């Protein structure tokens, strides 16, 4: 079979954008009513919060733990195969939750979904390997908007669908969306993957040894981890924090939802444009600017006096995320040997997922022991460390447009 035919990376970007949008929305669609659904399975009292927390965190934790394994298999068998595998399992598990007889089945299916996930990191690895190097920031920035858009639209749409069709049927609807993503991927995504001969497959250690700059690789993985910590740490207590900023409790949940989603909205609006800027002026420069901007915006959140001020700062914070995510992915694609792209992006996904789990834990722990404002200050310290580390990594490249020059 001829595997050297040039692929249309723009068409692949379009189709994978749709797939990533469906995957992103599938996770967030069920967020508004999942605790109520768990309650309907016979769980009562304080156990509802416990099992809800497990239902939310288990997929991210499981996905992070097995990401390197799926990354290796993607390097062996191709990214498209892994995307189809992930979307099929997500279709079955999300749809299957509609028939869960008790909370243990629900948790088991959520855990299984996490173990077999990987659609988004494999889409990212595929586009990173196919897009021209001078377009990688734009391509990866555009792809990043898919997950963010789905995550933004999901909660509000999920609440409406639950009221119209019932909570169980929403899981069937999500399963149908994921099935559509599977079919689109099978028939319209093309990859000229050349299998590596048996015995020539490089180990993860050998892949890392072939990375052109291991110090920068480690720094990019740390940045990926901290991006999620800064965006997620406030979520466990944001409603309670807002409550301390106002004497009115009218529409408190609605206001909290707007403030939480503000980061995603601005990131969605800016990622593609900022990705182009990274291609033009240097992704490493944009990472430093994004980190400094993130710190300048994040720290004042600890000193706001009204929900409006917090909302504005959260919205501005998204522009930092919009700069960082595509820039990190673009640099990863440039410093990674092509035979190890999937594994390196799998490690990035692992760091992202661990940040999603660590952020709420760190934020809620500091908020519980000290205060909400202290939690925000504490989280901002992670950003300072990242700024210093990134400056050390990039200092000799600041006068260059690319770290590969």
Curated annotation (Swiss-Prot):
One of its GO terms (molecular function) is transmembrane transporter activity. It is found in: Cell membrane. Pfam families: MFS_1. Its main location: membrane. The chain crosses the membrane at residues 13-33, 50-70, 88-108, 111-131, 147-167, 170-190, 216-236, 254-274, 286-306, 308-328, 350-370, 374-394. InterPro entries: MFS, MFS_dom, MFS_MdtG_subfamily, MFS_trans_sf, Tet-R_TetA/multi-R_MdtG-like. It is a multi-pass membrane protein. GO terms for cellular component: plasma membrane. Keywords: Cell membrane, Membrane, Transmembrane, Transmembrane helix, Transport. Belongs to the major facilitator superfamily. TCR/Tet family. Efflux pump for various substrates. This is Multi-drug resistance efflux pump PmrA homolog. It comes from Lactococcus lactis subsp. lactis (strain IL1403). The gene is pmrA.
